């Protein structure tokens, strides 16, 4: 069931939902019970696949546009520039203190408000946010926008206003079709995201970068942040104890060490 | 508690994880209803009753034949509104995650995902949730009803209690946008050859292999160890290896004596398919790869350097054990 090659998305407007996540050393702050976002931030790696797919669909069609939409703290712009450097045209960031601590209900609401304003033909999502591993956002957003939805897409084509996606489930592969405008979440196998070129990096700074507050969007404060959230965190605990794990650096004797270990564990 | 459990089914069988969640719900309270949505699904009601449902709602309609989420959101939302269930539970799959998240938006209802336990504490429902690659366990709850929860793959075993249930057909009214996505084709796996589920040793490869041709490295090591070859979704989706060899949430669940993970980051969705392995060995060049959190032996290094040598050493050991002539 090979899918025919991409036809250009003539004049298509594509919105890519991109989340900015902590680069390393992830921890939950015991005070706020939220993810500690104080360290270095980076573009959610799974969202680079969505950006790449958008750029592929856009091709060299000057009439098409790729806009990044993100909800997060103001300083997320630094990390989002990576996606601009890859080739996205502009970014709209919803940054508002009152949105901190938003759960799925609250964040999908705010995202849907921006996306409604943007009115894209195609809304792309990454496979999952690598801090929360939700892999659910698209379904909430699609419901709010009353648009068709295809998730986990590993291969996609657009032709004659219809998007066709191939995706894996627990039982094998599905091919699903939906007319534009449509919300689509891509798998991390859909493509190999490009590295930004030096020219791209230089050019990124000059691309339009808009920051909106919740009130700019007409989102009432009680629909955002903790007030707008319907889930809560009670306590943060240790994982159950598990057997000892050993980690060694390969200094050229990795193979020998593995064999020793396997013999020790009687696994050889 | 009045709980609704969404039951997924495939080829005339209710899914094992769905039944496991049903059993858990029955253990938490006695008023447990089940929703089965599909086309020609009447026959499944009795099975739901045997595994803990005291009431079964059937949404039986040709428009629900394809396993697509949005029509199921419509049906579930109507049912939940009508009966005021305070809790709605799902065994997590590709389909149910989309149904649950769609419902969260539709009903303005909290959704906690990836739960591995549910308990009642002073009348309050509390979910246990591993987070950040399972390095912390968080107790989570809901601020309002209905409370929606997705239970991690493979968490609860079904319990056959042998009960009976009242069965009620529900009206199927779909939103315009819910029927825009259509199933064009479904290719289900034909199983051929021995299944990796029975293998005693598994050598698995991920995107770190660098290309499909490098699966040869894995195959040689697997041969030396007398094992089978497995793969991650990333490489199966990319067409490097067949789906029948995939381990994880949407692939096989395996528990061999030895699992060797090569160039695999160790995502939760992979872990749920192989965490039951007796001994796990991983080679990954990234010292921060999540796989190192649960590998019994983790080697930080380049698999291209280590694996050929490892295969050679294992072959030499085999030859020493079974000398020729
Ligand atoms: C450890 C942890 C656990 C959490 N558990 C829950 C929970 O059980 N229930 C709950 O309601 N909330 C939870 N949250 C909060 C939740 O992550 C945020 O509300 C987030 O905005 C929603 O992301 P998601 O996890 O649904 O993303 P996913 O569904 O994993 O993200 C899928 C895609 O949606 C897009 N996307 C996601 N977030 C954004 C964003 N902020 N801006 C732009 N695009 C975005 C990206 O394309 C991304 O690839 C948790 C957060 C953390 C850190
Ligand atoms: C609903 C859903 C269901 C899913 N189901 C499954 C499933 O059933 N099974 C599954 O596997 N995944 C599943 N996934 C996908 C999962 O989240 C990960 O994206 C996937 O497992 C990653 O595969 P990978 O480890 O091969 O690739 P990556 O995450 O890209 O990891 C590659 C690793 O190779 C390492 N590496 C690179 N080069 C070398 C080298 N030379 N030597 C050593 N190491 C190297 C890198 O450091 C990296 O850690 C699912 C996701 C979702 C959202």
Model-flagged regions — what are they?
Chain A
Residues 2-268:
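N-terminal glycine-rich FAD/FM-binding segment characteristic of electron-transfer flavoproteins
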């Amino acid at each position: 069931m090979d899918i025919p090659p991409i036809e250009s998305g003539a004049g298509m407007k594509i919105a890519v939902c991109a989340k900015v996540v902590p680069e390393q050393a992830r921890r939950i702050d015991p005070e706020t019970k939220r993810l500690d976002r104080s360290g270095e931030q980076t573009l959610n790696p799974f969202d680079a696949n969505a950006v790449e797919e958008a750029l592929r669909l856009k091709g060299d069609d000057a009439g098409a546009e790729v806009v990044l939409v993100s909800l997060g703290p103001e300083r997320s712009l630094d990390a989002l520039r990576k996606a601009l450097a890859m080739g996205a045209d502009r970014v709209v960031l919803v940054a508002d203190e009152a949105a901190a601590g938003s759960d799925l209900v609250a964040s999908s609401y705010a995202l849907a408000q921006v996306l409604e304003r943007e009115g894209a033909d195609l809304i792309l999502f990454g496979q999952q946010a690598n801090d929360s591993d939700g892999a659910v956002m698209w379904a909430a957003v699609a419901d709010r926008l009353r648009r068709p939805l295809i998730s986990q897409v590993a291969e996609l084509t657009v032709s004659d206003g219809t998007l066709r996606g191939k995706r894996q489930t627990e039982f094998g592969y599905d091919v699903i079709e939906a007319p534009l405008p449509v919300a689509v979440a891509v798998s991390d196998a859909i493509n190999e995201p490009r590295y930004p070129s030096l020219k791209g990096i230089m050019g990124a700074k000059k691309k339009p970068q808009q920051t909106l507050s919740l009130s700019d969007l007409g989102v009432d404060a009680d629909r955002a942040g903790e007030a707008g959230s319907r889930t809560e965190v009670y306590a943060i605990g240790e994982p159950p104890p598990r057997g000892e794990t050993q980690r060694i650096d390969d200094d050229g004797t990795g193979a020998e060490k593995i064999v020793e270990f396997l013999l020790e564990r009687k696994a050889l | 508690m009045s709980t609704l459990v969404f039951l997924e089914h495939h080829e005339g069988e209710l899914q094992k994880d769905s039944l496991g969640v049903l059993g858990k719900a029955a253990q938490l309270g006695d008023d447990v209803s089940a929703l089965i949505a599909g086309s020609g699904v009447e026959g499944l009601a009795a099975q739901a009753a045997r595994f803990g449902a005291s009431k079964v709602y059937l949404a039986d309609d040709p428009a629900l034949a394809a396993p697509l989420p949005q029509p199921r959101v419509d049906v579930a939302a109507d049912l939940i509104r009508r009966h005021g269930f305070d809790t709605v539970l799902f065994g997590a799959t590709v389909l149910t995650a989309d149904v649950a998240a769609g419902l969260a938006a539709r009903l303005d209802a909290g959704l906690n995902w990836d739960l591995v336990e549910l308990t009642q504490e002073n009348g309050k429902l509390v979910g246990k949730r591993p987070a950040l690659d399972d390095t912390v366990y968080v107790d989570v709850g809901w601020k309002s009803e209905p409370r929606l929860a997705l239970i991690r793959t493979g968490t609860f075993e079904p319990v056959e209690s042998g009960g009976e249930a009242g069965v009620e057909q529900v009206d199927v009214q779909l939103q315009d946008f819910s029927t825009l996505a259509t199933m064009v084709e479904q290719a289900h796996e034909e199983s051929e050859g021995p299944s990796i589920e029975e293998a005693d040793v598994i050598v698995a490869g991920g995107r770190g292999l660098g290309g499909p041709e490098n699966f040869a490295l894995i195959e040689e090591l697997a041969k030396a160890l007398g094992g089978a070859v497995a793969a991650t979704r990333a490489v199966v989706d990319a067409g490097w290896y067949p789906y029948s060899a995939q381990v994880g949430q949407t692939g096989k669940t395996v528990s061999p004596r030895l699992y060797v993970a090569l160039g695999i980051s160790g995502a939760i969705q992979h872990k749920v398919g192989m965490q039951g392995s007796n001994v796990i060995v991983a080679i990954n060049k990234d010292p921060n790869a999540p796989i190192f959190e649960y590998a019994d032996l983790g080697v930080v290094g380049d698999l291209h350097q280590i694996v050929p040598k490892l295969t050679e050493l294992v072959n030499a050991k085999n030859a020493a054990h079974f000398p020729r002539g």
